[in-house]
Design a protein with these regions (language model features):
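N-terminal alpha-helical targeting/anchoring segments
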Residues: 1-119
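N-terminal catalytic cores of NTP/NDP-binding nucleotidyl/phosphoryl-transfer enzymes
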Residues: 52, 56-57, 100-157
C-alpha cells in the first residue's frame, strides 16, 4: 500500500465527480496533480496541488476549485480534514485509523514492507565512484561511494 498513491486516486476520483457535476470541464489532464507531504507539518498530513494545476486549463480560480473539491474529499472516511490554504492548495489531515492500519501493515510485512516491483526486470546502471587514478582521493569520493552503494542497494531491494 502506498498511502500517497491511494490518496491521489481519491483526489482524481473527486475531480471526476466535479467533471460529472459540470463543475469542471471535460478533458482535463490530471498528470501533474500531486499528493505529497506539506512543507509545514502543522498544515496536515498531505497536500495536493490539484486546484492550482487545473485552474488555468479550466478557466476557474484555483481557490474556487479547491473549495469545491474539499467537501468531496472530506466525505471519504480516511480524511479527517481538508482545508484550503493560500491561493488554492488543499491540505489534508488523515484519520487516526489510517495511521493505525499503516502500522499494522508494517508489523505484518516486517522487512518486506516498502518493497516494490516498480522497475522490476529493468536494468539500471549506477555509476557512483569516479576517482581519478592519478590524483589524490578526498572526502567527496567517499561520499559518492557511500551514496551510490546505498542507492544501488535500494534499487536492488
Amino acid at each position: 500500500m502506498n498511502l500517497f498513491h491511494d490518496i491521489r486516486l481519491l483526489v482524481v476520483h473527486a475531480l471526476d465527480q466535479m467533471v460529472a457535476a459540470d463543475q469542471l470541464p471535460q478533458g482535463l489532464s490530471y498528470a501533474n496533480v500531486t499528493v505529497e507531504p506539506p512543507r509545514d507539518p502543522l498544515h496536515g498530513d498531505m497536500a495536493t496541488n490539484a486546484a492550482m494545476v487545473l485552474a488555468k486549463p479550466s478557466g476557474q480560480s484555483p481557490r474556487a476549485i479547491a473549495e469545491a473539491l474539499a467537501p468531496l474529499l472530506r466525505a471519504d472516511p480516511r480524511i479527517a480534514g481538508a482545508d484550503v490554504a493560500g491561493p488554492g492548495f488543499l491540505n489534508l489531515s488523515l484519520c487516526t485509523s489510517v495511521w493505525q492500519g499503516l502500522v499494522g501493515q508494517v508489523l505484518e510485512n516486517g522487512a518486506a514492507y516498502g518493497r516494490s516491483d516498480l522497475g522490476n526486470k529493468r536494468s539500471v546502471n549506477v555509476e557512483f565512484v569516479s576517482a581519478n587514478p592519478t590524483g589524490p582521493l578526498h572526502v567527496g569520493h567517499t561520499r559518492g561511494a557511500v551514496f551510490g552503494d546505498a542507492l544501488a542497494n535500494l534499487l536492488d531491494y
